[in-house]
C-alpha cells in the first residue's frame, strides 16, 4: 500500500491524485499536487495531520489560491484544501464562527444578514477566511486583526480555539504554532448601518476594478508596502511597469501586480520578482518583501535573490515539511 492509499484509507473526505493546481490558484500557474485532500470535518482534519506526521509526508495548505505561486514542478506530498462547507459555523449575537475554507465574501454576507458591520475592509479581497486570517489581510479600511477574536487550530492531537492576542498579529502576518492548521475563524463585529456598510464595500470594489488589473489572472499584490512608501510606485520608478518575461508581465495598470498573459510559468513570474527586488534595492536601498507564498519544488536559481518570507514557503496555517515523500504511486 502506498502512502497515498494509506491516507485515503485513514482520512474521511475527498482525495485527488496528481491534482492540477494552476486552475486552483488566482494567477493560474503551477504544476500538480501528488495528493489533494479535502477532509470531511475537524476529526478528519486531525486524522490527516496525524497521518502525514507518521508517514513522513510533507503537508501544505492551499486556500482560495490568492497570494500563492505554485512551482512548475508542482507540490510533493499532500496539499490540504478545506471545503467551503465545514461543520461548526454559528452566529451568537455579535460573534460569528465560520469555516476557514469559506470564501471571504461569506463573512460580510452573514454579518449583514444579522445587522452587523465592521468588516468593510474585506470588500473585493479574494481568497478564503483562513488565508485572510493567517496573512492578516486588509486595506486602508482595516485588517483581520481588528475583528478576529479567536482561531480554531487543528493539530495531530485534535482541535482547539486560540485567542488572537496569542498569535502575534502584525502587518500582513501572524505567528501560528508550527504544524497547526486553521479550521475555523471567530470574529466579533457590531450592530450598525448595513446599507452604509454595503455602499462602502461597493465603493472599494469599484476602486479596485478601476486601479488594479483584475481582468487578468494575478495573485494580487506582489510586495508589501515599505513604511511610508508604496511598492507599486517603487517598481514603476525603476522602469519595470509593463516589463514582460515570457508570458508574465508587471501590469501596465498597477506596477505591484504580476499578471499572467496566458501560459506563464512560475519561472517567468519569479524572474520579474527578482528583477524588481534587485533594481529597487540598488536605486532606493529598500529591500522589498514579498506578499506571495511559494508552494512546491522550485529550482534554487529561481529562489536566489528572494526574501526569506517567500523562499520559506510557509502559508495560511500550513505545516510545510522538508521530508521528501515515498514514491507517489
From Swiss-Prot:
InterPro entries: FAD-bd_PCMH (IPR016166), FAD-bd_PCMH-like_sf (IPR036318), FAD-bd_PCMH_sub1 (IPR016167), FAD-bd_PCMH_sub2 (IPR016169), MurB (IPR003170), MurB_C (IPR011601), MurB_C_sf (IPR036635), Oxid_FAD_bind_N (IPR006094). Pfam families: FAD_binding_4, MurB_C. It is an enzyme of class 1 (oxidoreductase). Its EC number is 1.3.1.98. Residues 311-320 have a biased composition (Gly residues). Keywords: Cell cycle, Cell division, Cell shape, Cell wall biogenesis/degradation, Cytoplasm, FAD, Flavoprotein, NADP, Oxidoreductase, Peptidoglycan synthesis. The active site is at residues 172, 221, 291. Its cofactor is FAD. The keyword S-adenosyl-L-methionine does not apply. Pathway: Cell wall biogenesis; peptidoglycan biosynthesis. Belongs to the MurB family. This is UDP-N-acetylenolpyruvoylglucosamine reductase. It comes from Anaeromyxobacter dehalogenans (strain 2CP-1 / ATCC BAA-258). The gene is murB.
Amino acid at each position: 500500500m502506498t502512502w497515498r492509499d494509506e491516507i485515503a484509507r485513514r482520512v474521511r473526505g475527498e482525495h485527488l491524485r496528481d491534482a492540477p493546481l494552476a486552475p486552483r490558484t488566482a494567477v493560474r500557474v503551477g504544476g500538480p499536487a501528488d495528493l489533494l485532500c479535502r477532509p470531511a470535518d475537524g476529526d478528519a482534519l486531525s486524522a490527516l495531520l496525524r497521518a502525514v506526521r507518521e508517514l513522513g509526508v510533507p503537508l501544505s495548505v492551499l486556500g482560495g489560491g490568492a497570494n500563492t505561486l505554485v512551482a512548475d514542478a508542482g507540490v510533493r506530498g499532500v496539499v490540504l484544501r478545506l471545503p467551503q462547507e465545514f461543520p461548526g459555523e454559528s452566529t451568537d449575537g455579535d460573534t460569528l464562527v465560520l469555516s476557514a475554507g469559506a470564501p471571504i465574501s461569506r463573512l460580510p454576507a452573514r454579518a449583514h444578514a444579522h445587522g452587523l458591520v465592521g468588516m468593510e475592509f474585506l470588500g473585493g479581497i479574494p481568497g478564503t477566511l483562513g488565508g485572510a486570517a493567517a496573512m492578516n489581510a486588509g486595506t486602508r479600511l482595516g485588517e483581520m486583526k481588528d475583528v478576529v477574536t479567536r482561531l480554531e487550530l487543528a493539530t495531530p492531537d485534535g482541535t482547539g480555539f486560540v485567542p488572537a492576542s496569542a498569535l502575534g498579529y502584525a502587518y500582513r502576518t501572524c505567528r501560528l504554532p508550527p504544524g497547526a492548521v486553521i479550521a475555523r475563524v471567530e470574529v466579533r463585529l457590531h450592530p450598525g448601518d448595513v446599507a452604509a456598510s454595503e455602499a462602502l464595500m461597493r465603493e472599494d470594489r469599484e476602486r479596485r476594478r478601476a486601479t488594479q488589473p483584475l481582468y487578468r489572472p494575478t495573485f494580487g499584490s506582489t510586495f508589501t508596502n515599505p513604511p511610508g512608501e508604496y511598492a507599486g510606485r517603487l517598481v514603476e520608478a525603476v522602469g519595470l511597469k509593463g516589463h514582460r518575461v515570457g508570458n508574465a508581465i508587471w501590469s501596465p495598470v498597477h506596477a505591484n501586480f504580476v499578471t499572467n498573459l496566458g501560459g506563464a510559468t512560475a519561472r517567468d513570474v519569479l524572474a520579474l520578482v527578482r528583477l524588481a527586488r534587485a533594481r529597487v534595492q540598488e536605486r532606493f536601498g529598500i529591500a522589498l518583501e514579498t506578499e506571495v507564498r511559494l508552494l512546491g519544488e522550485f529550482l534554487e536559481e529561481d529562489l536566489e535573490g528572494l526574501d526569506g518570507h517567500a523562499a520559506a514557503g510557509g502559508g495560511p496555517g500550513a505545516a510545510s515539511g522538508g521530508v521528501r515523500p515515498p514514491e507517489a504511486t
